[in-house]
Amino acid sequence: MKKIAILTSGGDASTMNKCLSTFITYASKYNCEVVFVKNGYKGIYDNEFVKPDYTETKSWWSLPGTKIYSSRFPEILDEQVRKQMVDNLHKNSIDTLVVIGGDGSYKGARLLSKSGIKVIGLPGTIDNDIASTSYSIGFDTSLNAIVNSIKEIKSCMDSHANVAMIEIMGRHCIDLTVFAGIATEADIIITPESFYTPQQLLAKINEKRKTNSRGIIILYVELLLGTENIPTVEEYIKYIQANSKESVKKNILGYLQRGGNPTAMDMIRASLMTEHALKMISENQYNKIIGVDEFKVVSYDLETAINMKNPSRKDLIDKFFN
């Protein structure tokens, strides 16, 4: 039986708990024993290895956040700190370390792998900034939270014909901003790839007014405005209001984007990736990063499409119910 340690690292993401629940549920099927590491990489250093309670962990499947907690641990860059972490993993007879986190967490896993630790990575971050997967765990939940907030803001903007500038999380990844903009039919998005100066933004707003738009929704990605000689959002608003009759309202959604109840699709993807991690461990595959590839639009001839058969779900039934 292989003993695997699981930790959640970096920023919390809804559906991390679903991963933990799935690991507990299916570990025995793959002849694995699971222990949790509290507080991310710091927990390895502090020797916070805990044996999970099966019944309690099974109840976590729909809870947001991470019940084994997370932390930032830049000390992992120190060789002596890593040596202590490796020693603690060996003392606890850990065969494979599973890291649920983002890009920074993966870099930590790579450092430990170079010290001889077998690692598996699962993409857990709302930012969707991991190039090896189309969707990261928590992204869909965060996106839905953003969409719901925009809908509520839009109704207020429509009532008064105001402009809303809404900051969206994502660090240096624009996916939440772009996808939320598509979903809500936002009027304008501001990203490094679709950038507007205050003057250009006002011109764009004026264009929208010509189409009889009332409430105007502008989404901008965080960590852009106010950096590298770019005006702050307050300076954007000041310019627009000084040079027009527009009333502009600043909104920062902040942590509302991170703590929502997991969506069904997020939980399904988390389950699929977690089960695949267990399968890989049972097959002695390690130093791997798991992801999904789903961003593809296809088309078929009419006759071909009509004659196509719906896919069998037997593989899913076998994975999760047999």
Curated annotation (Swiss-Prot):
Sequence positions that bind substrate: T125, I126, D127, M169, G170, R171, E222, K249, Y255, L256, Q257, R258
User: What UniProt keywords are attached to this protein's entry?
Assistant: ATP-binding, Cytoplasm, Glycolysis, Kinase, Magnesium, Metal-binding, Nucleotide-binding, Transferase
According to its UniProt record, the EC number is 2.7.1.11
Domain of life, per the record?
A: Bacteria
Asked if the Swiss-Prot or TrEMBL record annotates the protein with the keyword S-adenosyl-L-methionine, the reply is no
Is ATP-binding included in the keywords of this UniProt record? yes
Q: Where in the cell is it found?
A: Cytoplasm
* An annotated GO cellular component: 6-phosphofructokinase complex
Residues that, per the record, bind ATP: G11, R72, F73, G102, D103, G104, S105
Catalytic positions are D127
Entry binding sites for Mg(2+) = D103
Cite the Gene3D superfamilies for this sequence. 3.40.50.450, Phosphofructokinase domain
Question: What name goes with this protein?
Answer: Probable ATP-dependent 6-phosphofructokinase
